[in-house]
């Protein structure tokens, strides 16, 4: 009789876990939808990105003036003769992938499903403010490096 109760308890817990995870998935999808809608439509989101890249210009100018400054803490020896550089991640730093995120929500999918197809479409647009910043850095003679996990 004791083992029958244990089996019953295990079945009830298992069923509850499935209900909760299904509800959790729905809640996650709803939260994801709200964040994507905000990123795609809120003027504040775009303005914040522009402000970040405008501030990056200020800090870039400060770094170019101060020859002893480096963002690479592992650089311990003479590096002032090296060409200045910046490193940016591509996705969500340079390229806006919220259309991909919206697509996955509509289809009830999640990353990485459809990611390679999205990347190959080449439909991502620039994050607000980044193009101006990269042009600014390039005019200052700064080498630009991009980091990505995209398949080439």
Residue ranges and their predicted role:
Residues 92, 130-152:
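Substrate-recognition element of Asp-dependent hydrolases with the DxDx(T/V) motif
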Residues 19-88:
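Non-catalytic pre-domain segments flanking phosphatase-related domains
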């Amino acid at each position: 009789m004791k083992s029958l109760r244990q089996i019953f308890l295990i079945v009830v817990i298992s069923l509850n876990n499935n209900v909760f995870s299904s509800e959790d998935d729905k809640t996650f999808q709803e939260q994801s939808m709200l964040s994507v809608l905000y990123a795609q439509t809120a003027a504040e989101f775009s303005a914040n990105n522009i402000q970040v890249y405008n501030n990056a210009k200020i800090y870039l100018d400060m770094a170019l003036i101060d020859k002893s400054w480096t963002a690479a803490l592992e650089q311990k020896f003479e590096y002032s003769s090296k060409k200045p550089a910046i490193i940016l991640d591509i996705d969500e730093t340079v390229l806006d992938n919220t259309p991909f995120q919206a697509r996955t929500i509509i289809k009830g999918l999640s990353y990485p499903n459809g990611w390679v197809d999205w990347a190959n479409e080449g439909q991502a647009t620039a994050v607000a403010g980044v193009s101006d910043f990269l042009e600014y850095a390039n005019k200052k003679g700064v080498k630009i490096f991009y980091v990505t996990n995209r398949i080439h």
